A protein has these predicted regions:
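Short cysteine-rich clusters marking metal-coordination/redox-active sites
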Residues: 73-76, 92-95
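Cys/His-enriched microdomains
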Residues: 71, 90, 108
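Short hydrophobic/aromatic patches at helix-to-coil boundaries
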Residues: 112-116
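Short Cys/His-rich "knuckle" micro-motifs
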Residues: 83-86, 102-105
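Cys/His-rich microdomains that often coordinate metals
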Residues: 79-80, 98-99
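Long, charged N-terminal interaction/targeting segments
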Residues: 1-63
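Intrinsically disordered, low-complexity, mixed-charge
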Residues: 1, 77-79
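Structured, basic alpha/beta domains of bacterial-type, RNA-associated proteins
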Residues: 66-67, 100
Length: 116
């Protein structure tokens, strides 16, 4: 249940930026989350609803966009999508190497804040 801590941090970012802009109300928050983060959308919205009570973000909708996992082959440099949760070994589609570095898939950040 690390959604609570992550959502609390996201709310702080939202309130800080909305406050700087003189917003009266936060309508929605667009968040980009890597598919490997294991954050559950429903719980993030529930925690956001709970934590934002009494703030200008109360009632705001969280819009979550998932970022797919991509890897860079350490041998040839090719960047490709793959699901590391599969039981099969991940291999580079260009050279079949198993040596790779995660490029995307663990991110979590506020992309946009809609205010009135």
């Amino acid at each position: 249940m690390h959604e609570l801590a992550v959502t609390e941090s996201l709310l702080q970012v939202v309130l800080q930026h909305a406050g700087k802009g003189g917003a009266g109300k936060v309508v929605s928050v667009s968040v980009r989350i890597g598919e490997l983060s294991d954050l559950v959308n429903e719980w993030m919205q529930r925690y956001f609803d709970y934590l934002s009570r009494g703030t200008i973000a109360e009632g705001a909708l969280i819009r979550i966009e998932r970022i797919p996992a991509t890897f860079r082959c350490d041998a040839c440099g090719d960047v490709f999508p793959a699901d590391p949760r599969t039981r099969e070994a991940i291999r580079c589609p260009c050279c079949a190497s198993e040596a790779m570095t995660l490029v995307t898939g663990r991110e979590c950040f506020v992309q946009q804040i809609e205010v009135t």
